[in-house]
Amino acid sequence: MNRQEKSVEISELSKILSSSGSVVVAHYKGISVAQIRTSKEGXREAGGGVKVXXNRLVKIAVRDTSVKEVSDLFVGQSLIVYSVDPIVAPKISVNFANDNKQFVVLGGVLENDVLDQCSIKQIASLPNIDGIRAIIISAIQFNATKLLRLLSAPQAQVVRALSAFVDKNKQS
């Protein structure tokens, strides 16, 4: 790789690091090329990506960001999994690590915060943004329906009482 190609690679890595909601760093020693290709396809389908790059280039790209500490993770055969949605990259990484024991999640970055391996696993267990929205909407809808029933109950009781009073007067 010549100097110009390295410069292009560094700028591409900087763009990925700055525009992603989350980035996960992992070791892939012992993983076949076919398995990495499969993980790249899975990440693309989920709205993310997987990038294998020379550690030195990634360290240079990270140097100008607010998460310089993550550069310590780039030792050995490392790759990055990234996504705009903060939960997608951790989910992809942890799922791939569960299927492939040689794939080791080291840590990562979530919106300018450096995370360790345990934090990545916790984030991966969360529902994605659409799932969170569905939970919030269902809670709002349930509470709105319950409130409507509570507000209409006294009116219904008054109407029933008046109806009974009218029926009683008609009979007399």
Curated annotation (Swiss-Prot):
The UniProt record lists the keyword Nucleotide-binding: no
Any one GO biological process: translation
One GO CC term on file: ribosome
Tree of life domain: Bacteria
Molecular function in Gene Ontology: large ribosomal subunit rRNA binding
Entry keyword set: Ribonucleoprotein, Ribosomal protein, RNA-binding, rRNA-binding
UniProt-listed CDD domains: Ribosomal_L10 (cd05797)
Gene3D superfamilies noted in UniProt: 3.30.70.1730
Protein family membership: Belongs to the universal ribosomal protein uL10 family.
Quaternary structure, from the entry: Part of the ribosomal stalk of the 50S ribosomal subunit. The N-terminus interacts with L11 and the large rRNA to form the base of the stalk. The C-terminus forms an elongated spine to which L12 dimers bind in a sequential fashion forming a multimeric L10(L12)X complex.
Protein purpose: Forms part of the ribosomal stalk, playing a central role in the interaction of the ribosome with GTP-bound translation factors.
Record protein name field: Large ribosomal subunit protein uL10
Species in which this protein is naturally found: Liberibacter africanus subsp. capensis
